[in-house]
Amino acid sequence: MSTTAAGTVPDVTPTRERADVRVAAPAGGLRGVLESSPFPILLVSLVGILLLTAFGPALVVGDTWLMLMAGREVVDHGLPETETLTVLGSGATWTDQQWLAHLVVYGTHALAGIRAVVVLDVLLVVGGLALALGAARAAGATSRSTFLVGLLAGLAGPGGWPMRAQATALPLFAGVLWLLLDAARRGARRRTLLVLPALVVWANLHGSVLLGASLTTVLGVYELVRARRLDWLPLSLAVLAPLCVLATPYGWDVVAYYELMLVDAPFAEILREWQWSSPGGTTARVPSPSARAGARARRPRRRRSRPRSAPSPEPASRRR
């Protein structure tokens, strides 16, 4: 209804047209991801159920028992500095960079047994996957594409499912990535600084913290260059992120550990996972289908100006 000098004039705008004008604002943050992402939520649920029902026993591997043993050493004797558990390595320097992961797994086993360790592993894997999918959705990826890429990632990385020290870092990696992606799109804010305490915890769980620290430093430098002025927030990210790697009880001595693992890995000649990543038959199994699918999606569709001709008969030499 509208009021004029002549009186009240009824609003004759069609109901359908008025309904089209009112567009609901999309929900943001975690709520928006949960409300509009049925496919990623389905994937996370399926992975969790699959791990608990079908792959539960397979999640306990040799590294799991190593974590339990190392965690017991931390509880009984404090942080190790010299190797005393094996004959071949007796007397060698032992920098237990993953001491916190070992302690958490040992404490879980001491409280509720090996089944609780399996449940903890499932929670870590599913939590990391959920955060990664949430980061993709928050960055603008569609629900279906997030589901498909997440499914391919799950098929490509079952080696990361067992209870190992790296499993404890999965939620931290995904959470740090989410914060960095948000800062890259909207600019660094105060909540971006949550990356720093996450890196400190990560530095005591697994050596992959170098990846998170490197990405954080790159973002800080990028924000400084883009702003063309010294802003304390991106400067803090660029300077403090590398220092978070040293925030362990071992302090500066942990540098020698990373040098050994990254430059001169002792098992690189016999274990593939210790080698540098390179294209090969193993790495091409899953990326190849996804790459072909991406190429098809990017290929422009052209309208045919003439009808499709009948296929030519196959040569006799090819039919043999």
Where are these regions (language model features)?
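Membrane-interface transmembrane helices that cradle and orient dolichyl/undecaprenyl
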Residues: 176-191, 293-297
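Start-transfer (signal-anchor) and selected internal transmembrane alpha helices
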Residues: 1-52
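Transmembrane-helix motifs of polytopic, lipid-linked glycan transferases
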Residues: 119-139
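Transmembrane-helix signature of polytopic, membrane-embedded enzymes
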Residues: 45, 132-155
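Short hydrophobic/aromatic helix or loop-helix immediately within or flanking a transmembrane segment
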Residues: 88-115
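Transmembrane catalytic cores of multi-pass membrane glycosyltransferases
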Residues: 63, 75, 80, 207-307
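Short hydrophobic alpha-helices at membrane interfaces in multi-pass membrane enzymes
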Residues: 144, 182-200, 232-236
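Membrane-interface alpha helices of multi-pass inner-membrane proteins
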Residues: 50-51, 153-157, 191-207, 240-245, ...
